[in-house]
Swiss-Prot record:
Superkingdom field: Bacteria
Organism expressing this protein natively: Haemophilus influenzae (strain ATCC 51907 / DSM 11121 / KW20 / Rd)
Family the UniProt entry places it in: Belongs to the binding-protein-dependent transport system permease family. OppBC subfamily.
Protein name (database record): Oligopeptide transport system permease protein OppB
Pfam families named among the record's database cross-references: BPD_transp_1, BPD_transp_1_N
Segments on the Cytoplasmic face: 1-8, 121-135, 191-229, 301-306
Subunit field text: The complex is composed of two ATP-binding proteins (OppD and OppF), two transmembrane proteins (OppB and OppC) and a solute-binding protein (OppA).
C-alpha cells in the first residue's frame, strides 16, 4: 500500500510542473502590463519599474528566476498591493477559502450520501421522487444563479441571514455561501449514490445477508455501504475541484475576503505574481486531492492497486 501511495504522489509531480510552466508563460504572454494605466509613465520610470521586477529580462530568465523563488516558497511581490508580498496576501485569504470549501465539501458528501441511500431504500416511492426532483434542480442550477436567489429570499425578503460579509467566519455568515456551493454537489452525489446503492442491494451477497435474518440497518452499514461508495469516491475528485473553483465565484458574490476576491482583483489589474500563484495553489490542491481520492479508492477496493 505504501508503494502505491508513493507511486501515486510521484505521478502528480510532472502534472504540477506542467501546470506551473503553462501558467507562467500564458500570464507573461498575455497582452498588456501590470503597470499599464490611463496615466502614462515616463520611459525612464517605466524602465526602472520593469528592472525592479525583472520584467526587462528575457522570458526564459524570468521563468527560471520564478522557479528558483518558488522552490524557496517565495511567490514574489504583488504588483497591485504595494509593499505586500503574495505570500502575505495568500496567508490572509487562504483560511477563508479553505474553510468555506471544506465545510461545503463535508456537507455535500454527508447530505448527498444520505439522500442517495434513502432514495435507494425507498425506490419508486414518494420520497424517491421528491429527493430526485430536488437533485435534478440542483444539477441544472449553477451556484452563481442559486446564490442570488438565496440572498433574495433569506437575506432581503425574510431578513434571517446576512447578505454578505465574513465576520470571522461565524455560522450565520457561512450559511448562504455554503448552501450556494453545496447544492449542485449534493445533487450529483445523491444521484450517483442512489444508482450505486440500488445495484448493490440487488447483489447476491445482500440476498444472503437478508436470508440470514440481518436487520436492514446492519446490512446497509456493514455490507452495502462500502461497495456503494466506490462510484461516489470517483466523483469526489471533480467535485472538490468544482467546489474550490466555485468558491472563487461565490466569494465575489458574497464579498468574502478569500482567494476568489484576490484572483478577480489580480486578473483585472494584470497582477502576474498574484494570479499565477493562486492558479498554482488551486492546481496543487486539485492534484493533491485527486491523488488522495485514488488512495482512498485503493483502500476500499484493493483490486486496483498495481
Amino acid at each position: 500500500m505504501l508503494k502505491f501511495i508513493f507511486k501515486r504522489l510521484l505521478e502528480a509531480l510532472p502534472t504540477l510542473f506542467i501546470l506551473i510552466t503553462f501558467s507562467f508563460f500564458l500570464m507573461r504572454l498575455a497582452p498588456g502590463s501590470p503597470f499599464t494605466s490611463e496615466r502614462a509613465y515616463p520611459p525612464e520610470v517605466m524602465a526602472n519599474i520593469e528592472a525592479k521586477y525583472h520584467l526587462n529580462e528575457p522570458l526564459y530568465k524570468q521563468y527560471f528566476l520564478y522557479l528558483e523563488n518558488l522552490s524557496k516558497g517565495d511567490f514574489g511581490p504583488s504588483f497591485k498591493y504595494k509593499d505586500q508580498s503574495v505570500n502575505d496576501l495568500i496567508a490572509s485569504a487562504f483560511p477563508v477559502s479553505i474553510k468555506l470549501g471544506m465545510v461545503a465539501f463535508a456537507f455535500a458528501v454527508v447530505l448527498g450520501v444520505t439522500a442517495g441511500t434513502l432514495a435507494a431504500l425507498n425506490q419508486n416511492s414518494r420520497w424517491d421522487y421528491i429527493l430526485m426532483s430536488f437533485s435534478m434542480l440542483g444539477v441544472i442550477m449553477p451556484s452563481f444563479v442559486f446564490a442570488p436567489v438565496l440572498v433574495l429570499i433569506f437575506a432581503i425578503y425574510l431578513g434571517w441571514l446576512p447578505a454578505g460579509g465574513w465576520n470571522g467566519g461565524t455560522a450565520m455568515y457561512m450559511i448562504l455561501p455554503v448552501a450556494s456551493l453545496t447544492i449542485a454537489y449534493v445533487a450529483g452525489i445523491a444521484r450517483i449514490m442512489r444508482g450505486s446503492m440500488i445495484e448493490v442491494l440487488h447483489s447476491n451477497f445482500i440476498r444472503t445477508a437478508k436470508a440470514k435474518g440481518l436487520s436492514m440497518s446492519r446490512i446497509i452499514l456493514k455490507h452495502a455501504l462500502r461497495p456503494a461508495l466506490l462510484p461516489v469516491i470517483t466523483y469526489l475528485g471533480p467535485a472538490f475541484v468544482g467546489i474550490i473553483t466555485g468558491s472563487m465565484v461565490i466569494e465575489s458574490v458574497f464579498g468574502l475576503p478569500g482567494m476568489g476576491l484576490l484572483f478577480v482583483n489580480g486578473a483585472l489589474n494584470r497582477d502576474y505574481s498574484l494570479v499565477l500563484s493562486l492558479t498554482i495553489l488551486v492546481g496543487t490542491l486539485t492534484i493533491l486531492f485527486n491523488a488522495i481520492v485514488d488512495i482512498l479508492y485503493a483502500i476500499i477496493d484493493p483490486k486496483i492497486r498495481y
